[in-house]
Amino acid sequence: MSQTALILLQRVEHLGQMGDLVHVKPGYARNFLLPQAKAMRATAANKKRFETERAQLEAQNLKKREEAERLAERMHELSVVIIRQAGDSGSLYGSVSTRDIAAAATEAGLTISRQQVVLAHPIKQLGLTEARIVLHPEVSIPLTVNVARSAEEAERQARGEAIGVQDEDENILGELQAENAAEEAAAEAAEASEEA
């Protein structure tokens, strides 16, 4: 399989640091790294150009990183609430996407794009979930996503209280146990009346 040689212009997660010579699949280079100016082809002319511009690129990167760190300090322990419909078991009708999280974060005062939101797994249940907001390739902040059916439920979840799904299950279990006890009492009464 052919590989394309590139020089990274910034840190790329799981690939390398600025200035690294990397070999990637042509599609990854053509569709992601080159259009987003994260890398340039590793030709002799580009290598010379990169070495002459390296100090300028590093200074730009340092400035952007410092801005991202200042923003990260201001947005420490950020949390967003997303209201969704869900079934009795707590399963969402659909899922919460990175686009939904980016929109909620923008409403909370942090303007980000959906590409900056990183989820470990899709959100398909009610509850609190951790996401990560990548402000810079070297700076990210945690984000708590509170998915609930209503604002009141979101407040209860934020305080650490159990939501209604478990309460309903306990009520149903209690009702079933009461019905079973009543049936057993009726059966015992019927047996006692037959014996007499």
From Swiss-Prot:
Entry coiled-coil feature ranges: none
Superkingdom, taxonomy of origin: Bacteria
This protein's name: Large ribosomal subunit protein bL9
GO terms for MF: rRNA binding; structural constituent of ribosome
Annotated family: Belongs to the bacterial ribosomal protein bL9 family.
Any GO CC annotation of this UniProt entry: ribonucleoprotein complex
Ranges annotated as spanning the membrane: none
Record key words, sorted: Ribonucleoprotein, Ribosomal protein, RNA-binding, rRNA-binding
Function: Binds to the 23S rRNA.
GO process annotations (BP): translation
Alphabetical list of Gene3D superfamilies matching this protein: Ribosomal protein L9, C-terminal domain, Ribosomal protein L9, N-terminal domain
